[in-house]
Amino acid sequence: MGTVTDSKAEADEHGEKTDGGVESIDAVQGHGNRLESPDLNNFKPNGKNVAYVSSKIRAGVKVDWPTDSIYHQGTADGPAGSEDGAQSHAKRVNASPGRIHIHRGASGGILRGLSGGIHLPTLQSITFEMTRLPDDDAGLQMHFTETKEVETLPETPRGSIRRAMVEVPSRKQSKLRKHLTPMGACSFGFRLSQIVLSLISIVVMCSNSQRMHTPEVDFGTLKFNHFQAYRYLIAVNVCVIFYSTLQFTQLMYIVILGISFIPSIVISTWTTYGFDQLFTYLLLSASTSAGTIANISYNGEMGVSLCSRFDLASFCARADAAVTLSFFTFLVMFSSTALAVYRICVMMREFHR
């Protein structure tokens, strides 16, 4: 829309003097004037649409003229804009300029034109953004523009330090610290302990076999599956490993991705509590029954000791180790149940507030 010409063409286009002319405004006289423009109701359009930027201010001032946003008509009264900018500014006050002419005046601190004086403060850079308003707001023949001034403060040591402090990106909080709560950390430890203890108990018990013999007779190989209590212990520990692995995987999803397999926190909490309590009872029953068999193997029944009579010290020791690990698994599962109860209490307290 607009064209930018050199300062030499200012006198030809507007009949104004660039330095020391009659229409030059001194810095003291124009200091009180602000970025305001005269009323355009009495202006007569001349068909020109020119923006002038002086060579003196091009290096220090940045003026952005959007191609599609500047559309204005009208000049000052009189031939070639003979009225002085300061007088025009005093007579006509309007917040919407029709056209802004910026050229070099007598003072380096004042930029003036046909539509009024413009006082530039001591800033490092100034950007003018021109936005065209809808035609309905300006009528059929008059078109106004909306002016926005964006000022950038000069660089100072204190300002640069403050800007550096603001621009330094804050460290992103890791997802592990974001989603992992103290109760979640305890759940991690409990689930991992359940998996490890149950797995070791299964390995020790399944590898337990020994030949049963006496000095006179060889009865063959004695294995764990010959005892129903030991088979029950293995079955319960397998179920515990499967359940604890699912819970551990869900905790990993919650910590890393922030999502859960069960969307509802109420259903998830009550489900965890129910299964924890179920496997706590199963571990207790399996461990006590297997412990009873191990005790009978050591002490014997009706005066007959299985371990000492048939030289099964290794078999009995392995069975005792597996039963002991199963008891530790029960204690960890009981701790998980207690933690689930605590979560339910916290949840109920939050709901009743």
From Swiss-Prot:
<dbReference type="InterPro" id="IPR006702">
    <property type="entry name" value="CASP_dom"/>
</dbReference>
<comment type="subunit">
    <text>Homodimer and heterodimers.</text>
</comment>
<feature type="topological domain" description="Cytoplasmic">
    <location>
        <begin position="1"/>
        <end position="184"/>
    </location>
</feature>
<keyword id="KW-0472">Membrane</keyword>
<dbReference type="InterPro" id="IPR006459">
    <property type="entry name" value="CASP/CASPL"/>
</dbReference>
<keyword id="KW-0812">Transmembrane</keyword>
<dbReference type="Pfam" id="PF04535">
    <property type="entry name" value="CASP_dom"/>
</dbReference>
<feature type="transmembrane region" description="Helical">
    <location>
        <begin position="321"/>
        <end position="341"/>
    </location>
</feature>
<keyword id="KW-1003">Cell membrane</keyword>
<dbReference type="GO" id="GO:0005886">
    <property type="term" value="C:plasma membrane"/>
</dbReference>
<feature type="region of interest" description="Disordered">
    <location>
        <begin position="1"/>
        <end position="24"/>
    </location>
</feature>
<feature type="topological domain" description="Extracellular">
    <location>
        <begin position="299"/>
        <end position="320"/>
    </location>
</feature>
<feature type="topological domain" description="Cytoplasmic">
    <location>
        <begin position="342"/>
        <end position="353"/>
    </location>
</feature>
<feature type="topological domain" description="Cytoplasmic">
    <location>
        <begin position="272"/>
        <end position="277"/>
    </location>
</feature>
<feature type="compositionally biased region" description="Basic and acidic residues">
    <location>
        <begin position="7"/>
        <end position="20"/>
    </location>
</feature>
<feature type="topological domain" description="Extracellular">
    <location>
        <begin position="206"/>
        <end position="250"/>
    </location>
</feature>
<comment type="similarity">
    <text>Belongs to the Casparian strip membrane proteins (CASP) family.</text>
</comment>
<keyword id="KW-1133">Transmembrane helix</keyword>
<feature type="region of interest" description="Disordered">
    <location>
        <begin position="70"/>
        <end position="100"/>
    </location>
</feature>
<feature type="transmembrane region" description="Helical">
    <location>
        <begin position="251"/>
        <end position="271"/>
    </location>
</feature>
<feature type="transmembrane region" description="Helical">
    <location>
        <begin position="185"/>
        <end position="205"/>
    </location>
</feature>
<protein>
    <recommendedName>
        <fullName>CASP-like protein UU7</fullName>
    </recommendedName>
</protein>
<feature type="transmembrane region" description="Helical">
    <location>
        <begin position="278"/>
        <end position="298"/>
    </location>
</feature>
